[in-house]
Amino acid sequence: ASNGEAPDALGAMYNHLERRGNIWGLTSDVRQKFVASAGLETFDASRHEYLMWLGCAGSYDGDFQKSLRSLFSILRAHGVTFGVLARERCTGDVAKRTGNEYLFQELATANIADFQASAVRKILTAGPPCLKTLGDDYRRLGFDVEVVHSAVFVSRLAPERFSASEKHSDSSSTPEVALHDPCYLSRYAGHADEPRALLTRIGAVLREPERSGRNPFCCGAGGGLLFEEHEEGTRISQRRFEQLQATGVATIVTACPFCAIMLKGAQASANAATEVVDLMTFVDGRIRPASAGAPTAGAQGTSEQAGP
């Protein structure tokens, strides 16, 4: 897109970003309804340690909003204080990855101004692309704050907060899962161990698929491919789903809304019984509330920068 030309699907997405500030072109009332129903407070630096960045998926995707509710439940149970901006616009991740630097700069400049006006110092996000953009690309623009992904944050909660008696609250048997590593979380930010540690601590047994850890196989959404019109042939998402399904598990866990979208699409195409579940949804209910006086996760230095 750097030369002014882009496929129709990307061109439509750019238009959505310019007009509505999100990749799907949805109106802000969709986000506002979710914020209200989830009981989210507007960020106030004097009361909230973290800005919760919802992102396009968290603001507008119904399935991922269910996952965020699980995350909010975990954070509230452990005394983590967080709020959201009254208004969000996309970080510009897809514009950046597909070569539309002008649009990225426009979105980033506006977002940085909002962050600075609200005195934001720590950002918590559940989207690996947002982690990469906020923690790396924005840092290169001079906005250098702590940015942490929710999977990393929750994995570093004090070990005593994980209740052995609740590990298998939904089943009498040990759950076996395959973990799909999001590229921006594992390969670029280097966080392959934390999701695994979290799953292990709640009693899950991991069955590793082909290409995992810090050398994952992409879900097929990265680099703007989420918006590409695919030609005939096997899609990347289908190939990845087959690799995960080959582990023989009934549940595939991931920590990225766009990975979930792609894998669920492949699951539906294959008419497979294997379910795709967000990590926070999987662990919600398996972590007991923090005891009175215990330090919050934020007090343990969970924040990380994304990227090199």
Please place each PLM-identified region on the residue numbering.
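Ferredoxin-type iron-sulfur electron-transfer modules in oxidoreductases and energy-metabolism complexes
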Residues: 1-18, 106, 110, 146, ...
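Iron-sulfur (Fe-S) cluster-binding segments and ferredoxin-like electron-carrier domains
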Residues: 1-3, 101, 136, 190-191, ...
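Iron-sulfur-cluster electron-transfer modules
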Residues: 1-133, 137-142, 157
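A short, charged/proline- and glycine-enriched loop
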Residues: 45-50, 171-177
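Local cysteine-cluster metal-coordination motifs and their immediate loop/turn environment
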Residues: 55-59, 87-98, 125-133, 181-189, ...
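Immediate flanking context of iron-sulfur cluster ligation sites
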Residues: 77-87, 117-118, 204-217, 239-251
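Short, flexible loop segments at boundaries between secondary-structure elements
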Residues: 143-166, 211-214, 268-298, 304-307
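Redox- and metal-dependent alpha/beta enzyme cores, enriched for Fe-S-associated oxidoreductases
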Residues: 159-162, 177-229
